[in-house]
Amino acid sequence: MRVLIDTNVLADVLLGRDPYYDIAYSILTMCADKKVYGYMAAHSIPNLFYILRKSMTKEERREVLKDICQIVKVEGIDSFKIISALDNVDFDDFEDCLQEECAVAVSADYIVTRNAKDFVSSRIPAILPEQFLEKYKDIMQT
């Protein structure tokens, strides 16, 4: 199974945000253990680098993001994906549209996000982290 993990779920882990941390961490563990193939959109990296600025030094941010890149694969954004996202009028948020473009490119089964409502017109179904874990908890056992 392939999942694209949205920036907000990654931020939950990196910032230790309650009450989301445990669930997000479990999903990353599934990726690290190769029980699920995890992906993130390339533009999530500069977004996370910025989001983490108040809680980590620049060096800490670099290291933690390199660690994340060892767990999930980074899907790049090229001009084709950008133009396709710009042409897509079904999304209110351009960044979400780019997430969807990356999910399509990696043939993801789901976009794991805390903002599933923002992906109602997505070609790839969005699922909340807790719903994903509930649905696929048997994967954790193997």
Walk through the language-model features, giving the residues of each.
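Active-site neighborhoods of divalent-metal-dependent phosphate/nucleic-acid chemistry enzymes
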Residues: 73-116
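Active-site-proximal, substrate-binding regions of enzyme catalytic domains
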Residues: 25, 45-73, 78-80
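A general alpha-helix detector
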Residues: 9, 47-48, 84
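Short beta-strand segments at enzyme active-site cores
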Residues: 40-41, 113
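Short, well-structured N-terminal submotif of metal-dependent ribonuclease cores
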Residues: 1-39, 53-60, 121, 135-142
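Acidic, PIN/NYN-like endoribonuclease modules and their adjacent C-terminal/linker elements
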Residues: 2, 104-142
